[in-house]
């Protein structure tokens, strides 16, 4: 079990919260998280790149010029890969890049990644509840009060982000906002600081604490 200090909106200590998740063995943790990140990045690829082979290029039924007497190399079709506009040899075709990974492994990788970043976790009580209208400055000032470096990549995890908070955060280049049910290994490992609401921490414990 790990304990986290809970801060209020002004950055002052407001209590403590605990998080207890089962993690991978130290010998396999890095490999497990690496495979989870590879799978996530592979699944984000569209796989729609496509080129025409010589069989698919239009035209080419007529011999471009006679066989002999021109001084040039013989050509039988304009669809040959040797000519500009001809077919492509071994070019890309639509395919899926998806990688298989067991559900238990995916959940274990997620729990391991979160617990590995526990030193960078900042838990906030009632995150942004005082905002009555979208204010980017309010969010950036709050992050400074919470001790987040100005140039840090920040991942904010809320139970159910409100539209006010979404609009307040979207103009901050290095700040990403996700819901607690959108947790993923890449975002957890990519960010320098993780800012969680108290409700999001409880939801994570509820969803991932039983395994």
UniProtKB/Swiss-Prot annotation:
The keyword Nucleotide-binding does not apply. Keywords: Ribonucleoprotein, Ribosomal protein, RNA-binding, rRNA-binding. Belongs to the universal ribosomal protein uL4 family. One of its GO terms (molecular function) is structural constituent of ribosome. One of the primary rRNA binding proteins, this protein initially binds near the 5'-end of the 23S rRNA. It is important during the early stages of 50S assembly. It makes multiple contacts with different domains of the 23S rRNA in the assembled 50S subunit and ribosome. Forms part of the polypeptide exit tunnel. HAMAP family: Ribosomal_uL4_B. The keyword rRNA-binding applies. Part of the 50S ribosomal subunit. This is Large ribosomal subunit protein uL4.
